[in-house]
């Protein structure tokens, strides 16, 4: 990456905008936004609107964040991953997680995320061991697509296919301008190459390849079904790539995205937008309770 001009430009932008720590004044402004909003207490509101109090049920999804190192440094990242982050799950902790998985029959999905999970030292061992312990489990890899072009990852697509891993890939738009604006110059082209490589080994057909869209700014995503149709048309027509499903995600106002909103003076308006558009239908599927 030292000699990658595109990465250096992205890193420079993040040093100037996305990596600067919030000042005390900015932290106080964020706190005031929440207080002035006058939003109802969440648990009470959840009960009134959805008839749900957030009580947990049997665990079905075991989600593991196995490290924060990433070959990208996106300006919306909720966990502030970047090439400068080196926190990673140890082998001891990975073993404990695998033990929990082996002894939790209610768990049907192992959801592996990061950072770029594929670049973490324990990733492949966790995938292989999961397949041995629980061949019935759906293994999800939260992939940024450009990781497939990283040195040493030339066999990654084959590894994922051989182990029947369900790839959920982030692609915030079907145009190069919008993706590069959020993720850095050249990211869109490398993402398309990653999709093509996955298609070559069977993804988007017999192997599951889903895409995730999240907005580029302080607004809500469009209807999922309509956007999936547009993604399917644009990606197939212009790049010859296919996928299974598209999921739209609403950005959480935390970490780097919250900093971005705060510095643009949009945090209060965005919080109000989220409260106004609270969707009670999503409550039963809340992951973390």
Predicted features, each with a name:
Residues 2, 226-227, 246-289:
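Accessory C-terminal segments flanking Radical SAM cores
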Residues 1-25:
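Intrinsically disordered, low-structural-confidence terminal and linker regions
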Residues 126-131, 219-237, 264-274:
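Short, electropositive alpha-helical surface patch
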Residues 156-169, 203, 230-246:
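Structural recognition of alpha->loop->beta junctions
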């Amino acid at each position: 990456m030292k000699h990658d001009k595109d990465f250096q430009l992205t890193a420079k932008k993040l040093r100037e905008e996305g990596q600067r720590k919030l000042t005390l004044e900015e932290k106080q402004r964020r706190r005031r936004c929440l207080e002035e909003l006058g939003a109802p207490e969440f648990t009470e509101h959840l009960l009134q609107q959805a008839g749900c109090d957030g009580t947990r049920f049997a665990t079905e999804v075991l989600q593991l964040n196995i490290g924060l190192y990433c070959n990208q440094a996106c300006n919306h990242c909720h966990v502030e991953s970047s090439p400068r982050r080196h926190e990673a799950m140890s082998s001891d902790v990975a073993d404990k997680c695998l033990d929990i998985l082996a002894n939790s029959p209610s768990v049907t999905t192992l959801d592996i995320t990061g950072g770029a999970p594929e670049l973490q030292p324990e990733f492949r061992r966790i995938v292989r061991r999961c397949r041995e312990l629980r061949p019935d489990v759906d293994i999800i890899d939260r992939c940024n697509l450009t990781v497939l072009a990283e040195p040493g990852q030339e066999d990654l697509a084959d590894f994922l296919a051989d182990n029947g891993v369900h790839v959920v890939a982030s692609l915030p738009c079907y145009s190069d301008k919008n993706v590069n604006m959020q993720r850095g110059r050249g990211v869109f082209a490398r993402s398309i190459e990653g999709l093509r490589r996955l298609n070559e080994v069977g993804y988007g057909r017999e192997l599951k390849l889903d895409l995730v869209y999240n907005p580029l700014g302080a607004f809500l995503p469009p209807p999922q079904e309509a956007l999936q149709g547009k993604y399917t048309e644009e990606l197939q027509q212009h790049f010859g790539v296919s996928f299974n499903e598209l999921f739209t995600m609403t950005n959480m106002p935390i970490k780097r995205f919250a900093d971005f909103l705060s510095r643009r003076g949009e945090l209060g308006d965005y919080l109000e937008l989220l409260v106004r558009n609270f969707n009670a239908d999503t409550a039963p599927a809340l992951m973390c309770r």
